[in-house]
Amino acid sequence: NIQECLKGADILMVVVPAIAHRFIAQTCAPYLKEHQIVVLNPGRTGGALEFFNALKQHGLRRFPFIAEAQTFLYASRALGPAHAKIFSIKNTVPLATLPAYWIPGVLKVINRAFPQFIPGDNIFKTSFENIGAVFHPALTILNAGWIEETHGDFEYYIQGTSDSVAQILEKLDKERLEIAAALGIKVMSAKAWLYTAYSATGKDLREAINANPGYSGIKAPDRLHHRYVDEDVPMSLVPLASLGKMLKVETPTINAIIHLASVMRGIDFWEKGRTVEKLGIKGMSIKEIRLLAVTGEL
């Protein structure tokens, strides 16, 4: 009973695949109160904006505090019903709110339980620093044969990131950085993120991945019908590519991964994904998008 769950709650930690964010927003909308804090763990790309739009479409005029985490705090795996293994806890995870001026107040409350959360500049920065967009879809698709043959019986990050695969990840990462730069937002490279989140260093991305003890022992997905594709393609790569197209930033590598994922899964991820139309920012200028992040007003 969602009404009973929300009654008396001050903080709502939403820990579901991003494909469920809109459903959660629609389900909770009739019962949410202004004082409550909703944290998407994580938002992926555009999570807070999609959640806000879903509440607005439901008729809300007074909103709870909506926040999104840049990534999930834990490097973990579900091992069975009510059974999970935490491989590592990240050093820090940026968190941003819509609008951005809520960040200090929300963090003051959240940090009492989770000191790892730190201020993110705004929801577009946390969305662009969604490193799952870089690692998950491409790494899964490029290791599809190995995953299907072994049912994921290999170390996903350590063994899955060969020299050639790492080159593709770095190119995809470069396109992500270029889209952010077009909006005037400076974001970390995937290699820099590995150092910030896990203190892992290396001369290139592959070396940094191999140097991360938090990835040691993490197995690959046992099938391709997995959130690394079904969540991260439509909720991470599609919004990046869609925004890139609007800003006239070329994204051939991102587009290629979206296309391959769509063919492989028999799903039109462009249709299912978070496009600029669905996020309510189609046709907006760079100034208007940046103002939206600060004020929360469309």
Region spans (language model):
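Internal alpha-helical scaffold of NAD(P)-dependent oxidoreductase catalytic cores
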Residues: 80-155, 159-193
